[in-house]
């Protein structure tokens, strides 16, 4: 029963180092190893056991193998066969197998503790033609020569399942340093910084002593290769004593700004380029190990066997460590640098003009201004009145006759030849011979059809109605025309409706009324033709006295003289203009004539300054009696009191009004409540008394029955 049953067994380590308890971040990796060991098939386990025995006298060497196609196919089939086996064999293990497995796991634990730190493998060169994979081949010391003689090609081994390095997240364990070692390191760092500062100070002192010399070509420092430092490496957990990487230092941008030489004049220390070896092919990135193929069935079983992450206890390492240590900022010596004053090279634009410029501008303005003297008017010396020059009188506008359309029409009418009226002359015609033989103008009498006798249709029960044979009109059968078949090669394109914009046009009903009038006249003519015309002889005209109508002669339009408004306007404007000129001349003459005003100053009283009526005591002592005055604060206080009184009065009035409104509302509410109570109380109403119903007998006589006489046979 013990062999067949699947019991839970574990292998706890015999020795446990409590000092490295906080450093071991993969303490729970043992559970994953046990689950992986249980999932290994028996054939693979035997191979691993043999490899463990030969591990002591063996060396692992990376050999670049290029397996042939046959080997690859054989190995692939072998792996598939192994994985397709059932997993009951792994569950039903014997005691011997379990003991061997435990021994193997102990050995692996010891090897891991004593194993050196893993370094990343070298990158493959680009020029390497071999595409084979580096696989570690185990060679024993005793059988190495024999193996090389017998087997020219190494056999393909089964790849062991292992978690990739990315998922392991194992930190390189570094030995903890003592406090003395840490202090020594700090001392060395401080000494280095002091030496650097001394060198900088000496250099700055030399530059200050020498002063600004001739411009020298600036010395550009040689580019120094710095190793790459990825931020992803900092995400891994570090111990408290583990030093930070020296490849990359955090640089303060503000402090690095003034590191370049202040000016190209200063001489910098020259130096030869120091060649440093650098390998572009090497890198710190660890290559991910290619994971082996695992079938879905194995993945599902492993998932069910593995305990989920939510049931694992949280690591209390961070809680035990406490808060993160605060980094101390190291104080550095200040580097004295000479200020680069640029006052000499500064040029401000002068906006204010100097006195010389202002004087030059004034001279230019004076030279530009030229005085032009006008001719002397002799009338001023003569002493006569200075009159303005008369403006030139323009000729009045001459009226030009208009070409009116009425005159054109009159001329056209005169040109038309007078139409001579045709004189009526009577010509006798021969009498028709038909009038003597027959009646003329009377239509023939229409012959009515003979009446056909028919028996009377009495209303009898056995009467058989003869259906009237109605003449059936021949109905016009519509002709159906077949539409043409469409061509299948041409695609169907529907006819789009044209978007026509209807323009509103003026219309009238005159044409329609005319058409209706014509139709009406046609109908009347037809009716007249149907009527029998009566012959009425007209009397013969008298040919002795022929009276023609008098000829109406129209008188031509006679032209009359007419006055245009333009001529009147021109004459009135001239008159107004002359009047204005005369008035202006009068005003100018009056303005020129000098008229002296009367001297009123002589008759006025002279100005006498008033003396101050001060006493001698006031003038000597200097004491002056102050007049009464009123402060603005007192004035404002009075105004404030009045304002407060007005406010109090208005507030009192408001409060009175509010109380009155409140009382009214209360009274109205009381009245409404009382009315509601009265309405809610049910009061019984008395039964209404109506008049009694009196039944009266009808006075209408009874109907006398009579037989209906449907037929006319019994009538006399």
Curated annotation (Swiss-Prot):
Instruction: Outline the segment boundaries, as ranges, of region: Disordered.
Output: 35-167, 262-291
The biased composition feature labelled Basic residues covers 85-103, 123-136
* Biased composition annotated in UniProt, kind: Basic and acidic residues: 104-115
Question: Where do Polar residues bias regions lie?
Answer: 49-77
- Is Chaperone set as a keyword in this record? no
Which keywords does this Swiss-Prot/TrEMBL entry list? Cell cycle, Cell division, Cytoplasm, Cytoskeleton, Microtubule, Mitosis, Nucleus, Phosphoprotein
Choose one Gene Ontology CC annotation of this protein and give it.
Answer: cytoplasm
State the superkingdom: Eukaryota
Kindly name one Pfam family recorded for this protein: TPX2_importin
Coiled coil (residue ranges): none
Mark out the compositionally biased spans (Low complexity): 140-151
Q: Which residues carry this modification: Phosphoserine?
A: 204
- What does the record list as GO biological process? cell division; regulation of mitotic spindle organization
Could you state what the record's PTM comment says about this protein?
Phosphorylated during mitosis. Hyperphosphorylated upon assembly of microtubules.
The annotated subunit structure for this chain is: Associates with microtubules. Interacts with aurka and plk1. Interacts with kif15.
Q: What does this protein do?
A: Spindle assembly factor. Required for normal assembly of mitotic spindles. Mediates the binding kif15 and aurka to spindle microtubules. Required for targeting kif15 to microtubule minus ends. Activates aurka by promoting its autophosphorylation and protects the phosphorylated residue against dephosphorylation.
The protein depicted here goes by the name Targeting protein for Xklp2-A
Tell me what organism the protein belongs to: Xenopus laevis (African clawed frog)
The upper taxonomy is: Eukaryota, Metazoa, Chordata, Craniata, Vertebrata
Gene (name only): tpx2-a
